[in-house]
Amino acid sequence: MDANQQTRANPFGMDADCRNCPKLCETRQQIVHGYGDVGADFLFVGEMPGEGPDRTGVPFTGDERGEALQHVLGLLGLNNSLPTDDEPELENAFLTYLTRCRHPERPPTDEEVGNCDPFLTAEVRMINPEIIVPVGQRPLTTIATEYTTTPAEEFDVSEDHATTVRGRGFEIVPMADPLQQTDAEREAFVEHFLALMDRDYRQTKGRRGR
């Protein structure tokens, strides 16, 4: 983590009392902004906070889905703490969501995703990652729409899991929902990502295409 970084939690000081989505304001415990290393090469983007992150305030923590992702980060050398920790010691990784507030009974609407887009766009610009990892179908569709020239409907996270997609300024490595991954799928992602980390991925910026 950057020596000048004061905190891993919401390090860019984003609005902690946003009211742009009235229905989500009624159901959330708190806003869950990004967390991690502001100088990270790897940005992981989920759809919305689950019950655990809504409680802890930290993306991908406090529940089984979060523990599954943190376990993978540990295998990749990006998490120096236990998968169950509510404040993981991330290095070279940043975690965030399309939407920052939880609704317990439904996924976010397109309008709610749009309302949160300025937060995600700002994080992408300030972190300037080398690799974006959309976690799940909705993040993959959203990231692909924004950062590739391929029609979003051509992406399927079950097929694109553990592959590398060339984007505009970034490479994209889709990940299936951590809770729905088989052991083989998890191993495939770790193997693919370790191979990616072992090459000079920092020279991929600016390449275009799918």
Named regions from a protein language model:
Residues D2-R210:
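A polyanion-binding, active-site-adjacent surface
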